[in-house]
Amino acid sequence: MRISGAEAVIRCLLAEGVDLVYGYPGGAIMPVYDELYKFQDQLHHVLVRHEQGAAHAAQGFARATGKVGVAIATSGPGATNLVTGIADAQIDSTPMVCITGQVGKHLLGSDAFQETDIIGISTPVTKWNYQITEASEIPEIIAKAFYIARSGRPGPVLIDITKNAQFDEFDFSYEKCTGIRSYHPKPVLNLQKVQEAADLINNAKKPFIVFGQGIILSEAEEQLKRLIEKSGIPAAWTILGLSALPTDHRLNVGMVGMHGNYGPNLLTNECDVLIALGMRFDDRVTGKLATYAKQAKVIHFEIDPAEVDKNVKTEVAVLGDVKEALTALIPLIDKKAHDSWHNEFKEKYKIELDSVINEELAPTNGKGISMGETIEMINKHSKGDAIMVSDVGQHQMFACRYTKFNSTKSNVTSGGLGTMGFALPAAIGAKMGRPDREVVAVIGDGGFQMNIQELGTIHQTKVPVKIVVLNNEFLGMVRQWQELFFDYRYASTVMINPNFCAIAEGYYIKSRKVTKREDLDAAVAEMMASKDSYFLEVMVEKENNVFPMIPTGACVSEIRLS
């Protein structure tokens, strides 16, 4: 079958099972959009309002479904506008394929209109990228792109296609990629290392499990549950590990990290064996590396060899797919309870409950609405069944600390890059990927204005996303740091905001503003009952700080409750 390169792009996407893409047309990608028009009954294109929105929507889709998200843009600024989303996907291991148009082959390097070296620009933030200059390359390269994006430790791939390659015709055939000779995404599991890990775990007096997004990416949630229930080991999640285990599981002791729970952070430095499952020991988890878990023997289950011993020295490294590794490990583990060790976590939780949590979820200080009680009200009406999409800042930490999760792939947030403006487009992608689930986007007044234009995408597509803006009229997280570490010098963190509800109404999205605590319950109930998109602005306490907190560069044992 002889077809154009542009048609080949569409047929390749369909062959990979893609039925939804996010993008924004432009000159260098117009041949592909012309073919999209012809195939619109098979491949739905969502017109975003900014290419960064396309990247984040593709991320949200991927995070909520486990499938590869796809974003399309033109050359020049279209391509560069994708880069922040690509970088976010890279550090958070999100499978994504981005397709960009490029000037014709004969114009490369001539500084032609809307020409940028997107391959050079994106190299540090992609798992792989490639520029196609001949139509005949398209099937093989796109097949490789999807294989690389989803295999091993997932990540983003960018394919740049010159305009001549889109127009030229060739004899088309497609074969999915199942392997690349020089690329080995999944290390072969070493059963001797699994046995060594089991021996350490069985002999431990105070073992502690910290699990990350690797559990979700590997779909190892059931293996995690079986391991902790058999071993009796307390388990804590990282910010991207949220929802891999139900919040109310009896062995779930909370979240580690800068704004995680008091007990898991403090007791990291008291455990004798630390078992890390599908997480990368980033600085927000470890605090001061020189003092992190130095008393413990560390076991690291990890698919990416580059992460082993990168930050934390391990006693045993088990390389490979974490689902496969845990399946091999569980039969070797002794059944235990570790009751006295669990009691230490319970004691620390009681301290946090009395000093932080109770007041945050049900304030008695006479001040305004807290972010925590707003999240708790969402829990009340979602019953833990919603997908929570959070932006970046204080509200993100409150959402991650207090959202109730019943099932996996329910937490979508920007973890490693910390990208403000992530949540609104990511929520669009999450809802389109999982139309059977309620999707709630919780956003600060600062981050909301970074991609506020995607309200237009919601209006055009009628995707029923619930949007909650927690408005404290500050860049709250920066302000908190200025209060604690810069003697209340609030430099450029005060926000003079527009009428958000009027803007939402301008996009024909029903809106409501809450300024009084007594109105919060009814407003959240109305939002969650709506079958359409809904915008809820909650005016929260202006200087509502998020605690506990490990100051930057401090030891996890120096976690502050106030």
Task: List each language-model region with its residue ranges.
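N-terminal alpha/beta PP-like core and its mobile active-site loop of ThDP/TPP-dependent enzymes
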Residues: 1-340, 377, 381-384, 464-469, ...
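Active-site diphosphate/adenylate-binding microenvironment
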Residues: 6-19, 27, 32-37, 350-425, ...
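Active-site nucleophile and cofactor-binding loops and adjacent substrate-binding regions
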Residues: 24-26, 45-56, 71-78, 133-134, ...
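Thiamine diphosphate
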Residues: 99, 107, 113-114, 309-319, ...
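Phosphate/pyrophosphate-binding active-site segments
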Residues: 136, 174, 295-392, 517-526, ...
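A generic structural signal for residues located within well-ordered alpha-helices
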Residues: 154, 219, 369-373, 422-424, ...
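Generic enzyme active-site microenvironment
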Residues: 158, 300, 389, 442-443
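A glycine-rich phosphate-binding loop feature that marks nucleotide/adenosyl-phosphate handling sites
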Residues: 160-165, 393-395, 541
